[in-house]
Amino acid sequence: MQVLVNKIWYEGHPLRWLLLPFSVLFALITAIRRSLFRLGLKSQTPLPVPVIVVGNITVGGSGKTPTVIYLIELLRQQGFNPGVISRGYGADIQGVKVVTAADSAASVGDEPAMIVARTGVPMVVGAKRVDTAKALLAQFAVDVIICDDGLQHYALGRDIELVVIDGKRGLGNRHLLPAGPLREGAWRLNQVDFVVVNGGPAQANQYEMQLSPSAVLPVNPKAVAVFDPTQPVVAMAGIGHPARFFETLTQQGFQLALSHGFDDHQAYDKEVLCELAASRPLMMTEKDAVKCRDFAQENWWYLAVDAKLSPQFDQQLLSRVRSVAAAKQGKSHGV
């Protein structure tokens, strides 16, 4: 199914024309929803600290999670205490839940498990972003909130909107769902504060981001094996665009005996992956690794990657955060 969807969205498959009437309906529904917030018929909840929303206008992976991790580290370096909120996609969460390093990806979601495993940041997940933000502020001394994937969740007040675009696939056929991959029209890019292009050329007023491989690490934290870079590996990826990961491995000099793409947010079975690897080293993404660490074999590995953005982006982002923080502090003191 995903193969057909990709052909419709990114390769000009003629089935898109049959889906266009549904895209028109989707556009109407989303326009009405935005109007309800704009007219004040639905309320947006402001928060006492700067809120950065990291999202996209397309369905599927674009590099949001590495961007969130980059922002966490950038803000910490400048003396801020950031916290993160997320939906926890794929997990059955009742109300809100604080994410800990001991939580499984199944219980909190792939991305939250990865973010907390990598950074140890205070993080709360739940279906309603406003509730997660309030819980985060109530339980942790955070002074900036990063919302992982909440661009279309308009009930959450936000001060900075950052959109991440897949530099290889762009906006596809530029149609709204279901004929195309867009959650909102391309016009939305003109309204956000920052547009980050992952792995492709940036246009004027956009920022280029590269994902730089940093280390090959064992999926099983107790493993004592040493990775042999001369041995062919079986590559797997359950992300929005698996081909991007396989290309990265090839560019880094890995020999791929086999590559297999799974659906995004795929739940994995130990026996299936053991059969796939067939005693060869199994190489996966960091997001896949958090779902496999409890049953990982000695020769299962993941490639950690770090987002790289320009000093100009850092300067502009930090300037905006400081400005918003000062304004909110002044308002809280009646200035």
UniProtKB/Swiss-Prot annotation:
Binding site for ATP: 58-65
Domain of life of the organism encoding this protein: Bacteria
CDD domains: SIMIBI
Gene Ontology molecular function: any one: ATP binding
EC number: 2.7.1.130
UniProt-listed InterPro entries: LpxK, P-loop_NTPase
GO biological process: lipid A biosynthetic process; lipopolysaccharide core region biosynthetic process
Pathway assigned in UniProt: Glycolipid biosynthesis; lipid IV(A) biosynthesis; lipid IV(A) from (3R)-3-hydroxytetradecanoyl-[acyl-carrier-protein] and UDP-N-acetyl-alpha-D-glucosamine: step 6/6
Catalytic activity: a lipid A disaccharide + ATP = a lipid IVA + ADP + H(+)
Keyword Mitochondrion attached: no
Keyword Transmembrane: no
Keywords tagged on the record: ATP-binding, Kinase, Lipid A biosynthesis, Lipid biosynthesis, Lipid metabolism, Nucleotide-binding, Transferase
CC annotations in GO: plasma membrane
Family: Belongs to the LpxK family.
Role according to the record: Transfers the gamma-phosphate of ATP to the 4'-position of a tetraacyldisaccharide 1-phosphate intermediate (termed DS-1-P) to form tetraacyldisaccharide 1,4'-bis-phosphate (lipid IVA).
PANTHER family hit by this protein: TETRAACYLDISACCHARIDE 4'-KINASE (PTHR42724), TETRAACYLDISACCHARIDE 4'-KINASE, MITOCHONDRIAL-RELATED (PTHR42724:SF1)
Entry protein name: Tetraacyldisaccharide 4'-kinase
Organism of this sequence: Shewanella sp. (strain MR-7)
